[in-house]
């Protein structure tokens, strides 16, 4: 074609159609350039044969893992050792994926100064500051640590109160790091504007 001057009959190409739902057809989170991570709920059923991203990725991953287990391949450890213990492995729930992205303690986490337990084994993390590099924590995306805490889904918060009067609705959704949206000065502002 005009934008891609390649003859498909002369190259080894295979096209896969992956009919995915759009964001409004499944529960999940959306993120924007302001670092806001906001939860949304399914608004409508998907048309036709469309399935969730999670179901598509699960199908690819489980087949790939089986292939690696049976045939081997380059760098098999990340594929064979990846955690995939969702309630419904062939279609992970968005809530479970969000909790895994947030992270949890794989062992009791203690305060280095006092030795007191600050996060119990199995508990969701409240902040990226609780992540450890010794294998005692797990997080799918460190900047999302704090988005799903022991108090629940922080992305689903809908408190639009603005007690400061500055347009900071800190109880609405969640922003990283540590839900700090609106708390940092804009680097474009002069010192007097901060």
Regions found by a protein language model. Give the residues of each.
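Acidic, Ser/Thr-rich low-complexity intrinsically disordered segments
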Residues: 92-131
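A glycine-rich, hydrophobic/aromatic-adjacent loop/helix-cap motif
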Residues: 133-136, 168
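Non-catalytic alpha/beta scaffold blocks inside enzyme catalytic domains
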Residues: 1-102, 142-152, 157-165, 169-194
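Polar low-complexity intrinsically disordered regions
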Residues: 23, 109, 113-114, 122, ...
């Amino acid at each position: 074609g005009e934008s891609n001057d390649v003859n498909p009959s002369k190259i080894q190409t295979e096209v896969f159609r992956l009919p995915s739902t759009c964001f409004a057809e499944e529960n999940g989170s959306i993120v924007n350039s302001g670092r806001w991570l906001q939860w949304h709920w399914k608004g409508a059923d998907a048309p036709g044969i469309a399935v969730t991203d999670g179901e598509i990725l699960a199908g690819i991953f489980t087949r790939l893992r089986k292939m690696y287990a049976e045939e081997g391949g380059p760098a098999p450890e990340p594929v064979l050792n990846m955690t995939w213990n969702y309630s419904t492995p062939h279609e992970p729930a968005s809530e479970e994926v969000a909790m895994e992205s947030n992270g949890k303690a794989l062992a009791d986490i203690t305060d280095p100064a006092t030795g007191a337990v600050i996060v119990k084994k199995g508990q969701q993390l409240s902040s990226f500051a609780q992540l450890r590099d010794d294998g005692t924590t797990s997080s799918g995306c460190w900047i999302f640590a704090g988005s799903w805490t022991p108090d629940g889904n922080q992305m689903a918060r809908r408190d639009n109160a603005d007690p400061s009067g500055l347009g900071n609705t800190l109880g609405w959704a969640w922003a990283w790091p540590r839900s700090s949206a609106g708390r940092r000065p804009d680097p474009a502002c002069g010192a007097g504007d901060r």
